[in-house]
Each structure stands twice: as C-alpha cells, then as structure tokens.
Amino acid sequence: MPPQAQILSDMVLANNHFTNEWPVPGCSSCLPGAHPSTIWTRATYFEGVLGLYRINHDPSIYNYAVQWGTFPNWSLRNGDTDTSPDDQGAGQEYIELYQFDTTQTNRLTHIVNNVNSWVKGNVGLKQWTYVDSIHMSMPAFAKLSVLDSNVISGLKTNYTYSPQMYSYFHFIKSVYGRSNGLYNATDHLWCRDTNFLSNYTASDGTKQKCYWSRGNGWAFAALARTMDVLPTNDLHYAEYLQTFQDMAAALKAVQRPDGFWNVNLGYTNDYPGPESSGTACFTYGMAWGINHGYLSSTTYLPTVINGWNALAIGALHHSSGADNGFLGYEQSTGSKPSDGQPVTYTSVPNFDDFGLGLFLLAGSQLYQLSASPGITLAAPVLTDNQVQLNFTVISSLTNATLELLQTGQLGTAWTTNTTAALTTNVAGISYCYTVTNIAPTGFYRIQSSP
C-alpha cells in the first residue's frame, strides 16, 4: 500500500500542474473552443478537487473551487430548465460547496430549480439514454434528497428526489433500447448507448462486444457517489449496491497485468493499451467499496493498489520539465474506444480537466484506505440529525478512538471523541456506527486511531 504522504504528494503534483496552467478557474477561454466553465468536463475535475480538499484542507484549493462557482453565479450551462444530464454535473459540486458553508444558499438556487423542473414532470425518462448521464445526473438527485428542507427553505419543495432518480436509473438500466436497457445483466457491464447493443467492428476488423471503459467508469463511480450520500434504508439502495458489487467483480476480472484497464472491456485487442480515465473510475469505486465495507479488502485491495500504481507511477509524469504532473494515457472526450486514438503516455487529450478530476477522486479514496490502523471517511448527514459512519479496519487492533469532525464554514470545526471496541486481532472487519443529535447539515468524517 502506498503511504499517505506519497498519495497526497502525487495528487498535489497533478493538481498543481493544472492550476499553474489555468490559474483563473472560471474563465471560458481556458477550455477548448471557449466552452463555458460549467461544462461537464470541468465539473468532473472539481469532483476530484473537493476530494483533495477534504483530505488536505488547503484553503487555496477551496477558494479555487469557490471562484469557479462564483464566476457563472452558480448557474448551470444552459439555465434552470436545462434538460441535459451533463449540465447537472456542475450542480453536484455546487451542492458540495454549499455543504462546506451552509450560509451560502445561493450556491443551491440554480441546481435546485433545475432538478425541480425535472421532478415536476417536464423532463422525460429518455434524457438518460447514454451511460455518461448516470454520472452527470444521479449524484445531483441523491445529494438534494438528503439536504434538510428547513435549511434551504424557499428553494427545496416537497419533491421526492430519490424516487425520481430511481425512475431514470431503472429506465436506462433495464428498459431503454431493446426493452432491457443498456446494462448487460450477464456480463455486468454497460453499453455506452444503443449504438453498441449489437457487436461492433473493433480496430482489428472483427465483430466484438463493446463495453467502453470510461462509460462503465461513469456508471461505477456514480453508484459509489450516490450510495455515499443516500441513507442505507433508501428503497432502492440494495439494487444500487448489488449492481455496484456485480460490476466490481466483472471489472476486477478484466484488469490488465500492468494495473490499467483497456478502452474496451469487452475485447482486449480493440485499441489495446493503457487508459487512465476508466482506470481512475474503477480504482476510485473499488477503494470506496472497501472503505465502506461493501467490497472485500482481501479480494479487491490488490486490484486497487495495482490500479493506483498504474496511474501514479505509470501515467503521472515525474520530471524536471514542464510536463511534471501531467497525466498520460487519458482518452479524449467521446463515446467509444476509437475516439482520441492513439492514447499514449505523452498524448494530450482535447480536455485536460476531467481525467485529472477522476485521478484525484481515486487518490482521495486510496488516501483514506492507506491510513493505519483505520481509515478516514467522509460521512454525509442522514435524516433526523444522524450521521452514519462506515469503515473497514485495515490493521489488527482492539479498539479505536473515533473522532467526528464537522466541516462547515471554512475555518470552523466541531469535534467529539468516543472509544469503540473492535474485534480483537482481526483486520478487514467492517463497522458501522450511527451518531445522533448532531448539527443537521454539514459534512463529517471519522478518524480512527489506536
């Protein structure tokens, strides 16, 4: 297992390479073709940025993210009635930034209005017709579903976000296309869209299955990000978890010996070679699953370590030149294995932000997993002023001091400590604690130590 200091160092190195190139986070000119800074690629980057901030608490990182949201006045790319799932990606990060400072309800206005317009029935189920939409949209619904309505009175109505979220998920998973969805319940992998339900022509000219790596990464990471905030008693939590666990097993089986995953999970000879963005998604999701006790550390920890080493050693540039911190092997935007080829150690993707965000997400979970003897977790507030803490002990110990940290407005903290008895001399055991009578909003984390 890489030490925490090295994991964090690699994350900071990669992020600094990006922020040095783009010091103004909200500008439109810092994206190809003058795209607005609320585009999904930049939103995905900030998913990882906030993951980095949660573990190093660097104010400059937080301020960089706030500047990004402030520039468009916390709006979505195409307005409050926008029907594109992609554009809800920015809203996910607005919600998280609100959770860091719950006095700033303006950060919620546009994403709440947008999701409300969906829930009211103005947006049909066919908006989720490509697997990317799960990642861009699903966590936004989940995050809104657990916010305290009293805190954002006047914004959130009585809409039930979780049931509507499931309606979209069920549609794309089990209905859309040929009436059985984009998810293959036998292979436990996803077709990116209906164009790939039939075998397609691979790069060697043969007809093969196409399970696009990053497309499956979108779904896998989205399930983790969704379950991370949903209460476990959510009506459909069990299905999300089962899908996640089935995918994990399928993904583990097709990892390359070098730790990467191919661009096509269904056929290794289709544009063979390493690819970073899908690898980062899978590494993130599996590490999250181990951290929360949903995946066996014995089974999946080697896969996670190999995935991270592929990214941090095989893809991340460590040099004395301008490329120091550049992440290689990243496929450009697209929808299939052929897009952005050739993908190499030095190839520059058309957007340099989203792959980095996924790398930072993976690092944020591996950092928690690498802690000894326990791990540090982010834990969202559930209903009734409770927070649920799930963690897996990595090393053998008999008890741990659990420190609950509330992170709200920057610079404030509230702590409480309790000692929990743990299974004697057994590593890899998962625990769940529920803490009650806490502040109704905010983000919490648990730190276990001897």
Could you describe each region identified by the protein language model?
Residues S372-P450:
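Short, composition-biased motifs enriched in small/polar/acidic residues
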Residues V131-D132, A142-G266, Y271-T283, L295-V343, ...:
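Extended ligand-binding clefts on enzyme/binding-domain cores
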Residues S9-H17, S75, G124-Q127, A185-D187, ...:
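Surface loop/turn signatures of beta-propeller and other carbohydrate-active proteins
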Residues P2-F46, G51-G91, L97-H110, N114, ...:
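CBM-like carbohydrate-recognition segments
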Residues T105-P139:
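Asp-box/WD-like beta-propeller blade repeats and closely related beta-sheet repeat scaffolds
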Residues N20, T70-W74, K120, S174, ...:
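Amphipathic alpha-helical segments of tetratricopeptide repeats
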